[in-house]
């Protein structure tokens, strides 16, 4: 993501559920703060939260975010599970055009990649696929595990490369 920081495109992190997209946004937020971005210029929204109404519209989304922007400075928008908002593409496009923003969104593959993206965001986004852990990444998570690489490979093949699985012990 660092490669695309400040690039005037919507960065869309897409992948299957539980593959680590939200964690990547959390890590990005930490990196932004460490690099000197004021915390009040980082707007993080998780649209699966109970804080949002089921019937939230693109206008509600747009106005809610705009109301958090207190000045003309650059704002970093970290929008998690945006596909939960009908018409999110319009809101994000308007924020890209009408505000000083660097926008990152996540969502699940099936709902996120609709035809509306091509309508509202053509040429204005980059899709960044997020996958489950590779075996070498899985080994990195398990480096304190005393089992042999072969045993860990069997576990990886049996349970998959989801980060939550890599943190657990499923013997």
Model-derived segments and spans:
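Phosphate-binding site recognition
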Residues: 1-171
């Amino acid at each position: 993501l660092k490669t695309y920081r400040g690039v005037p495109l919507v960065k869309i992190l897409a992948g299957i559920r539980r593959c680590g997209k939200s964690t990547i946004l959390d890590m990005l937020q930490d990196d932004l703060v460490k690099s000197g971005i004021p915390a009040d210029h980082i707007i993080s929204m998780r649209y699966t939260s109970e804080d949002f109404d089921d019937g939230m519209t693109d206008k509600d989304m747009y106005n809610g975010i705009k109301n958090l922007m207190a000045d003309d400075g650059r704002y970093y928008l970290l929008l998690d599970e945006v596909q939960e908002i009908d018409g999110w593409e319009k809101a994000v496009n308007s924020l890209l055009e009408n505000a000083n923003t660097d926008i990152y969104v996540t969502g699940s593959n099936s709902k996120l990649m609709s035809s509306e993206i091509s309508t509202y965001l053509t040429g204005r986004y980059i899709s960044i696929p997020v996958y489950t852990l590779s075996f070498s990444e899985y080994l990195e998570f398990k480096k304190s595990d005393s089992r042999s690489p072969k045993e860990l490979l069997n576990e990886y093949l049996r349970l998959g490369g989801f980060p939550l699985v890599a943190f657990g012990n499923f013997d």
